Amino acid sequence: MTPRIDLRSDIVSTPTSSMIEAMAAAARRPRGFGMREDADQQELEALAADIMGMEDALFFPTCTMANQAALMLRCPPGAYVLADRTAHLCGVEGSSTAGIAGAPVLGLDGVRGHLTPQQVSATLDQPRQETQMPIGLVWLENTHNVAGGTARAPKAACSRPRPRPRRMSAGR
């Protein structure tokens, strides 16, 4: 029988004995008190950066903290976040999204936890009234826990063509 691997959440996994030993050993080592001083954290961040082909990575102790940092970096305060209505960000983190990042969630009924490109385009193309907040970010979760761990295809058509920027010069 093939062993079942459940990746919905870290709380449904069972650590192996070597994982427990590694956690116990890590807990016995003294830690730094400053930003990014911990050797284990540095090693984890370097590994993540290498795997992702990035210059650097940053470890967050919780998904909520990582999501809030992403929102604050990518969505202006006062703008909506467009997401599937069942997204973790919409349900579990909805109040922190609005309260901490200043970005309320506009939830749509997606397909198996994912917004379709047509839904995103139709929503973004709707005329907004002056008193309505703009949509500042489209949030796509992968994998989607509430929808049974469904994953979006890596090449899913989620973008739409953007007009080419016009070059302006002082002489024209």
Regions found by a protein language model. Give the residues of each.
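Active-site phosphate-binding strand-loop segment of PLP-dependent enzymes
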Residues: 7, 115-166, 172
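Membrane helical hairpin/interfacial module
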Residues: 67, 77-85, 101
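Glycine-rich loop at the start of a catalytic domain that most often binds anionic cofactors/ligands
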Residues: 69-78, 96
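Active-site-proximal loop->helix
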Residues: 92-104, 168-171
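Short beta-strand segments
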Residues: 61, 83-84, 109, 136-141
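Conserved N-terminal alpha-helix of the aminotransferase class I/II PLP-enzyme fold
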Residues: 15-63, 85-86, 90-92, 96-98, ...
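Solvent-exposed alpha-helices and their adjacent loops that cap or buttress functional pockets
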Residues: 49-52, 73-74, 98-100, 128-133, ...
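N-terminal amphipathic/basic leader segments beginning at the initiator methionine
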Residues: 1-23
